């Protein structure tokens, strides 16, 4: 069975299963929901089975490789494969998408299209992390944008058209640089088009060309991650999207930028990365503090959490720029950790809005009396976000801290400066998160709740189940981080072996 096309099955199963949904009766909401949830769960179980039985965790090379001709005259192949870098993010995709599907249970408007788009997005994201061909990588990068665009445009809030336009302009504009860079790398040095990552990694480019390619790819990933100053689409998008879509955006979409930065910029363009690494660290440090300060000034709950996400992505940049095993391990762990925590916070923001019908913090207050379970969960995940010891965020941020401190690439003064800025960001994080909790749950009673009993307003079994599923891996990773670090540790060492610091 090792020769079975497992990865092709994993990539195509959701979208092919989604093609059946249009044949369901339009009023069969429950049937569509359960069918989609069943497909997501089956996909996640299949991913887990394949990785447990066929993936060698101590081997840094690409495994489960598949290569099929797709478009002969372009030498365009369907090339798939996984390694330690992709396995954690594919598992995260399966886990978050399954829970986001369950979170979307209240959606009743045009459910057939909604759940088809959820499954199409699932395939696009898994396909991107499994791609071993740079043109296929670009194809999956673009394919994933279409479901997000429609989910935001149709099921978004009042300003959804503005947010959708901004989202597509930023992301599609950045994608052009991936296509241009991919074709340049593919044609360079030969009339034969070379697109697979393995052959591209063996190519040598003039330093000037490598720098230009690096900057082009970096712009695309800076939009997606996002990196200051190309981040402004994210708060608008999160502010208008349905909370199940927000879970996918925060949990998976942002991680595509970090993945591309490691997979292409670090692995394929190591000389340019060595030059730009100090700038990446500097931007990451500035982003942590800048986004934290902006987050504190936000009145809108979802926008505050969105800026919190931008701040936390600064740690990913510092870890990538540190060029140490510890720092890069921390960066990847931060992507996984934030995927879980960010998805939980946006889900909590969504179910809070369902009850209060407002996202403005200054219009809330005293809701802990009416929503004690939501209050408990919101407090727990906020503690995880501010990197409380014993939770995954603490381990990730500590590794990034340690990575920059032990790096031999930077001077003592530079490391001290970056560490101080990081520390300021870590101090600001509890300020805006605890302030958020105070405004939401403490103080005067929320007047709109006076006619409801506590049991009517608090989280139900479905919502509690989603939150418990998210808190378990956050605490588990925090207490035993090696359970996930072992997935990509050998790959991190392999990537950094290309650099001489």
Swiss-Prot record:
| Annotated signal sequence range | none
Q: Name one Pfam family in it.
A: Proton_antipo_M
Q: Supply the EC number(s).
A: 7.1.1.-
User: Which cell locations does it reside in?
Assistant: Plastid, Chloroplast thylakoid membrane
* Reactions that this protein is recorded to catalyse: a plastoquinone + NADH + (n+1) H(+)(in) = a plastoquinol + NAD(+) + n H(+)(out); a plastoquinone + NADPH + (n+1) H(+)(in) = a plastoquinol + NADP(+) + n H(+)(out)
What is the membrane topology here?
Answer: Multi-pass membrane protein
Supply one GO molecular-function term.
NADH dehydrogenase (ubiquinone) activity
Which Gene Ontology cellular-component terms appear in the entry?
Answer: chloroplast thylakoid membrane
Source organism, top-level taxon: Eukaryota
Q: What are the TM regions of this chain, as residue ranges?
A: 4-24, 35-55, 87-107, 113-133, 134-154, 167-187, 211-231, 242-262, 274-294, 310-330, 331-351, 386-406, 416-436, 464-484
User: Which protein family is it in?
Assistant: Belongs to the complex I subunit 4 family.
Protein name stated in the entry: NAD(P)H-quinone oxidoreductase chain 4, chloroplastic
What are the leading ranks of the lineage? Eukaryota, Viridiplantae, Streptophyta, Embryophyta, Bryophyta
Recorded name of the encoding gene: ndhD
């Amino acid at each position: 069975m090792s020769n079975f096309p497992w990865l092709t099955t994993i990539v195509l199963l959701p979208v092919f299963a989604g093609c059946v949904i249009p044949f369901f009766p339009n009023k069969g909401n429950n049937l569509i929901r359960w069918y989609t949830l069943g497909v997501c769960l089956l996909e996640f179980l299949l991913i887990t089975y394949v990785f447990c039985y066929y993936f060698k965790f101590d081997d840094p090379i690409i495994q489960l490789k598949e290569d099929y001709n797709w478009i002969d005259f372009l030498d365009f192949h369907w090339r798939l494969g996984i390694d330690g870098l992709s396995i954690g993010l594919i598992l995260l995709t399966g886990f978050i998408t399954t829970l986001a599907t369950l979170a979307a249970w209240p959606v009743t408007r045009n459910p057939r299209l909604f759940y088809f788009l959820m499954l199409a997005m699932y395939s696009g994201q898994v396909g991107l992390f499994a791609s071993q061909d740079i043109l296929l990588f670009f194809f999956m990068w673009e394919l994933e944008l279409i479901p997000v665009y429609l989910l935001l445009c149709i099921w978004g809030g009042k300003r959804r058209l503005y947010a959708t336009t901004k989202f597509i302009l930023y992301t599609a504009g950045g994608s052009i640089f991936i296509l241009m860079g991919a074709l340049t790398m593919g044609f360079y040095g030969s009339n034969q088009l070379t697109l697979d990552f393995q052959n591209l990694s063996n190519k040598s480019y003039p330093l000037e060309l490598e720098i230009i390619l690096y900057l082009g790819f970096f712009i695309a990933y800076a939009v997606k991650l996002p990196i200051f100053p190309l981040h402004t689409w994210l708060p608008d998008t999160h502010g208008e999207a349905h909370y199940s879509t927000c879970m996918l955006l925060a949990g998976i979409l942002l991680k595509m930028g970090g993945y591309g930065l490691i997979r292409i910029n670090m692995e394929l363009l190591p000389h340019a990365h060595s030059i730009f690494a100090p700038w990446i660290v500097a931007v990451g440090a500035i982003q942590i503090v800048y986004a934290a300060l902006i987050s504190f000034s936000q009145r809108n709950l979802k926008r505050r959490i969105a800026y919190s996400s931008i701040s936390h992505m600064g740690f990913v940049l510092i870890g990538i720029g540190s060029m140490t095993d510890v720092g890069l391990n921390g960066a990847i762990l931060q992507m996984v950790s934030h995927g879980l925590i960010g998805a939980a916070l946006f889900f909590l923001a969504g179910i809070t809005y369902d009850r209060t019908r407002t996202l403005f913090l200054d219009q809330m207050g005293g809701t802990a009396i009416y929503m004690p379970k939501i209050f408990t969960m919101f407090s727990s995940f906020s503690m995880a976000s501010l990197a409380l010891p014993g939770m995954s965020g603490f381990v990730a941020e500590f590794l990034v801290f340690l990575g920059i401190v032990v790096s031999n690439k930077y001077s003592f003064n530079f490391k001290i400066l970056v560490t101080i800025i990081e520390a300021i960001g870590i101090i600001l994080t509890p300020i805006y998160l605890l302030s958020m909790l105070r405004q939401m749950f403490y103080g005067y009673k929320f007047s709109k709740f006076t006619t409801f009993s506590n049991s009517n307003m608090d989280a139900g079994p479905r919502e509690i189940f989603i939150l418990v599923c998210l808190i378990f891996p956050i605490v588990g990773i925090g207490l035993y981080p090696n359970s996930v670090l072992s997935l990509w540790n050998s790959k991190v060492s392999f990537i950094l072996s290309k650099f001489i610091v």
